[in-house]
């Protein structure tokens, strides 16, 4: 694989490789960017977000996406869906630029997830139970600037949630929630069709386009 570089988002530097909690594998940095909102004519940056994926992702994505440019990938809803739902592990690090309580963060995530699931008719008791667990994990968590919320997503359907105050990664997660829809929804909310970080999407497209197009012999599914 081509050399993977670090990415700096505001004052936070995301390293090229990490070993996330809840996995025994090393992941490479797929892309990173800010999440912000336009408030009274000014762009306010709330979090810096990095998306890491395991090495197997490149050969998996190359089957369908080899030969595409970074711009073509950025404009493709299906490309990001294939990252979210692909048969490989993903790790997302959400680092605070401005302080945000765990309750504020988790309630917004759950609100968006439930609205989407209801709109497509996939909201069941299992999802209701999973979102309640999700809210509980974040209940008394404070996230000052520099603190991170960490998500390790298994293709088997588990979501490992962890926290870090100083940028270091703990060995073990705080909670594991087994629900495939919730597991995928967290990353979907960041890089999906209405993802909250267009900058992270562009970064992913540019870096993965290079890796995919350099990849030899894409495997057939």
UniProtKB/Swiss-Prot annotation:
Pathway: Secondary metabolite biosynthesis; flavonoid biosynthesis. The keyword Chloroplast does not apply. GO terms for biological process: flavonoid biosynthetic process. Part of the biosynthetic pathway for all classes of flavonoids, a large class of secondary plant metabolites, many of which are brightly colored. Pfam families: Chalcone. Substrate binds at residues 47, 112, 189. Gene3D superfamilies: 1.10.890.20, 3.50.70.10. The record marks 105 as: Important for catalytic activity. It catalyses: a chalcone = a flavanone. Keywords: Flavonoid biosynthesis, Isomerase. Belongs to the chalcone isomerase family. One of its GO terms (molecular function) is chalcone isomerase activity. Its EC number is 5.5.1.6. Catalyzes the intramolecular cyclization of bicyclic chalcones into tricyclic (S)-flavanones. Responsible for the isomerization of 4,2',4',6'-tetrahydroxychalcone (also termed chalcone) into naringenin. InterPro entries: CFI (IPR044164), Chalcone_isomerase (IPR016087), Chalcone_isomerase_3-sand (IPR016088), Chalcone_isomerase_bundle_sf (IPR016089), Chalcone_isomerase_sf (IPR036298). This is Chalcone--flavanone isomerase. It comes from the Eukaryota. The keyword Isomerase applies. It is an enzyme of class 5 (isomerase). PANTHER family: CHALCONE--FLAVANONE ISOMERASE 1-RELATED (PTHR28039:SF8), CHALCONE--FLAVONONE ISOMERASE 1-RELATED (PTHR28039).
